Swiss-Prot record:
GO terms of biological process kind: regulation of DNA-templated transcription
Organism listed in the record: Mycobacterium tuberculosis (strain ATCC 25618 / H37Rv)
Listed name of the protein: Putative antitoxin Rv0268c
Coiled-coil boundaries: 120-153
SUPFAM superfamilies xref list: YefM-like
Presence of keyword Signal: no
Family: Belongs to the phD/YefM antitoxin family.
Length: 169
């Protein structure tokens, strides 16, 4: 940055008769511009791109975002109106080591395999899987019959039939 080519120095000598140097203020401004944001992200541009100003605050924002991301939204609490969750949460790394034990546990209870704090897969027993598939097939059959016959029913009756309290939803 501070070194000048020989040809440029020679040109300055010839034009003035002595060595000319650029003012220190312009050099400082040029260096300061390099240290800050790129030209397309100056002053009001920071707001348009939703970046913090000055640039040194960016690392703090990322740190805060990282910290909040570790509190995953999948907790053992049940959502309003949902069924209680009676499954055990197991990290995938532990599941690799104890797969046979987890398969035995899945006969009694569902096992949720977690990857980085988020549910990745659910291990259920073969009987439960078959019953869920049968129930799904029955519901699809009922839906196709209702669609063919254009049957309508009140929402309260439908909620009672499905076992859902419509007033709470």
């Amino acid at each position: 940055m501070g070194t000048r080519s020989k040809s440029r120095t020679r040109q300055l000598k010839q034009s003035n008769g002595c060595t000319a140097t650029t003012s220190g203020a312009s050099d400082r401004r040029r260096r300061a511009r390099r240290r800050t944001a790129p030209a397309w992200l100056r002053e009001d541009e920071w707001l348009r791109h939703h970046l913090p100003h000055p640039p040194r605050q960016l690392s703090r924002c990322l740190h805060r975002r990282r910290r909040s991301a570790c509190h995953h939204r999948y907790s053992r609490r049940t959502p309003k109106g949902g069924l209680p969750m009676t499954s055990s949460l197991v990290p995938i790394s532990e599941a690799r080591a104890h797969l046979s034990r987890l398969v035995r546990e899945s006969a009694d209870d569902d096992v949720v395999l977690m990857n980085h704090g988020r549910p990745a897969a659910i291990l259920i027993s073969a009987e439960r899987y078959e019953s869920l598939m049968e129930e799904l097939e029955d519901l699809r059959d009922r839906l196709s019959v209702h669609e063919r016959e254009h049957v309508t029913m009140p929402l309260d009756k439908l909620g009672a039939e499905l076992g859902v309290d419509i007033g709470r939803v």
